[in-house]
């Protein structure tokens, strides 16, 4: 028999999370101690035995790092429990499964039976006096509706309790699997210290340990931990944004002006409109926005467009925000399931056309006059992008094809067209941009970018990236293509030499598409740091 007691669960989860935080602090100190021994200078500690001991503690530090990742997984899991309960409306619930599954179920059946018997008895009585005083039999419709509503709540309570139990159990199971892998890796480390019947760090065989099958799997464990923690961070952010939307959903859109735009969210590329409205700075270009652009961003967000999932009023049914433990991956549409709350979008759905009208109007204003709806001057780049943006906002409301009729181009093509109008020296075919990189170049760039923890971070946003998700081959500052092209022409090198330099992994770094295409991290000088 299951007994669900939210208060006890939340209290214990908070307590255990704090214990793990304390443990993490101690493990970090232990890792530093291991590293201190491993990094001892030869003048302080040398010899074959010394090298074995230093290698031993170097690998011990690696295992300590795995424990730290596991602890962070545990903390992420425990601190997400309040969100799980809130999603299921069980934050203050106390439920005994046997009461719901048996007592209430029996009461439902018995109540229906009693009412049926009473109605039959009353019908017989009324039939007996019908010739004297005709009377209508009372309606049981209200009773049936109330009983049906109670039965629905009973079933939903059981489903929610089972769902929360399943979600928490499956996610916790993921960390248990990682824990077993770390323990096995530690055992492999200990086995590598054995020599005959004795075991000591002085006998440590680093090659045997590092070549062991179990140790080779630690990268997968590391990735699984990183992916899970990243998922929980995103989940927490989405829940926070959903709360803000629910608070604003009951207000008419025209009241959501300057003080409210900071709380809207949503855009095809993520929640960039939320960031634009809240911070007043475009997260892609770094450009400071005018008041009109901030209001338009708020309107765009408030209309309810949710990344990946789609329009608020047309969200796909089914699925849960459950992390898949089988492949250590999660589906984006499931992770965004938290947005599927009727309260959040009820008002927004009804007002979305007006909101997009507001955002679109600001776009036309910028494109035609070079100023936003409040009269503030906008940059030339923003003006070029505004027309296509305004057109795109009208598409959901019957304006499909309008871009073609009015010859409106996409923002990238508008920018490209305006750039092409200016006269530029013709680039010889020898130095034209290649359409692809040689085999293995992208993999090498990714490997070169890994930090000491094995993570790859976007240089602009510092966000941890995933190799199996979209990323760009961004030029390192000083190695931009325009500089390389100019340098190649000045040196009059061959096409082969040009391609060899173009495919040099040392000239590139992994970047998020939004960071790479913003050109924000480029070196604006004409100096080329290559060959």
Swiss-Prot record:
Keyword Oxidoreductase: no
Disruption phenotype: Deletion of the yqcF-yqcG operon has no visible growth phenotype, however it is out-competed by wild-type cells.
PROSITE patterns (UniProt xref): LXG
Induction: Expressed on rich and minimal solid media likely in early stationary phase; dependent on DegSU. Not expressed in liquid LB, but only under conditions that promote biofilm formation.
Alphabetized UniProt keyword annotations: Coiled coil, Hydrolase, Nuclease, Secreted, Toxin
Coiled-coil residue spans: 2-39, 139-171
Cross-referenced Pfam families: GH-E, LXG, PT-TG
Record-level Gene Ontology MF annotations: nuclease activity; toxin activity
UniProt GO cellular component terms: extracellular region
Region (Disordered) location: 408-430, 469-531
Biased segments, Basic and acidic residues type: 469-483, 497-509
Matches recorded under InterPro entries: Bact_secretion_toxin (IPR051768), LXG_dom (IPR006829), PT-TG_dom (IPR027797), YqcG_C (IPR026835)
UniProt superkingdom: Bacteria
Subcellular location(s) per record: Secreted
Residue ranges, compositional bias (Polar residues): 408-422
Domain LXG intervals: 1-235
Family: In the N-terminal section; belongs to the LXG family.
Its job: Toxic component of one of 6 LXG toxin-immunity modules in this strain. They promote kin selection, mediate competition in biofilms, and drive spatial segregation of different strains, indicating that LXG toxins may help avoid warfare between strains in biofilms. Mediates intercellular competition during biofilm formation; disruption of the operon disadvantages the bacteria, but overexpression of the cognate immunity protein restores growth in competition with wild-type.
Subunit structure, as described in the record: Probably interacts with cognate immunity protein YqcF but not with non-cognate immunity proteins. The interaction inhibits the toxic activity of YqcF.
PANTHER family associated with the record: RIBONUCLEASE YQCG-RELATED, TYPE VII SECRETION SYSTEM PROTEIN ESSD
Protein name: Toxin YqcG
């Amino acid at each position: 028999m299951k007994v669900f007691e939210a208060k006890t669960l939340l209290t214990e989860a908070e307590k255990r999370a704090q214990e793990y935080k304390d443990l993490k602090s101690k493990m970090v100190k232990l890792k530093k101690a291991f590293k201190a021994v491993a990094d001892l200078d030869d003048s302080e500690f040398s010899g074959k035995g010394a090298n074995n001991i230093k290698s031993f503690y170097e690998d011990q530090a690696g295992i300590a790092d795995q424990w730290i990742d596991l602890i962070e997984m545990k903390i992420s899991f425990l601190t997400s429990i309040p969100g799980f309960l809130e999603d299921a409306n069980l934050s203050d619930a106390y439920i005994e499964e046997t009461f719901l599954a048996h007592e209430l179920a029996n009461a439902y059946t018995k109540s229906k039976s009693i009412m049926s018997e009473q109605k039959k008895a009353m019908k017989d009585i009324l039939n007996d006096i019908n010739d004297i005083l005709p009377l209508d039999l009372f309606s049981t419709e209200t009773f049936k509706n109330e009983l049906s509503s109670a039965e629905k709540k009973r079933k939903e309570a059981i489903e929610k309790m089972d769902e929360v139990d399943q979600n928490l159990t499956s996610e916790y199971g993921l960390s248990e699997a990682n824990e077993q892998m770390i323990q096995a890796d530690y055992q492999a480390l200990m086995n590598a210290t054995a020599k005959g019947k004795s075991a000591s760090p002085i006998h440590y065989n680093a090659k045997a340990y590092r070549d062991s099958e179990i140790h080779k799997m630690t990268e997968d464990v590391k990735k699984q931990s990183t992916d899970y923690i990243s998922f929980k961070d995103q989940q927490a952010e989405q829940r926070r944004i959903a709360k803000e939307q629910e608070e604003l959903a009951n207000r008419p859109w025209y009241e959501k002006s300057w003080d409210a735009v900071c709380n809207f969210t949503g855009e095809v590329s993520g929640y960039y409109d939320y960031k634009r409205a809240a911070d007043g700075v475009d997260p892609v270009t770094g450009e400071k926005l005018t008041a009109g652009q901030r209001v338009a961003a708020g309107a765009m967000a408030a209309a309810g467009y949710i990344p990946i999932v789609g329009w608020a009023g047309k969200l796909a049914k089914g699925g849960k925000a459950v992390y898949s433990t089988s492949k250590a991956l999660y589906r984006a549409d499931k992770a965004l399931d938290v947005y599927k709350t009727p309260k959040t979008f009820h008002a927004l759905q009804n007002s979305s056309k007006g909101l997009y009208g507001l955002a679109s109007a600001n776009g036309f204003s910028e494109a035609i006059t070079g100023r936003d709806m409040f009269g503030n001057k906008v940059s030339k780049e923003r003006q070029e992008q505004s027309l296509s943006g305004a057109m795109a906002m009208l598409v959901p409301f019957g304006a499909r094809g309008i871009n073609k009729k009015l010859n409106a181009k996409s923002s990238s093509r508008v920018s490209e067209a305006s750039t092409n109008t200016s006269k530029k020296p013709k680039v010889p075919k020898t130095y034209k941009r290649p359409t692809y990189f040689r085999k293995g170049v992208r993999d090498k760039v990714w490997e070169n970018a890994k930090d000491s923890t094995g993570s790859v971070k976007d240089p602009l946003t510092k966000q941890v990236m995933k190799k199996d998700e979209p990323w760009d081959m961004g030029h390192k500052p000083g190695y931009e293509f325009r500089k390389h092209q100019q340098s190649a022409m000045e040196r009059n090198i061959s096409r082969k030499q040009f391609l060899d330099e173009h495919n040099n992994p040392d000239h590139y770094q992994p970047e998020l598409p939004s960071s790479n295409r913003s050109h924000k991290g480029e070196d604006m000088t004409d100096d080329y740091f290559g060959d």
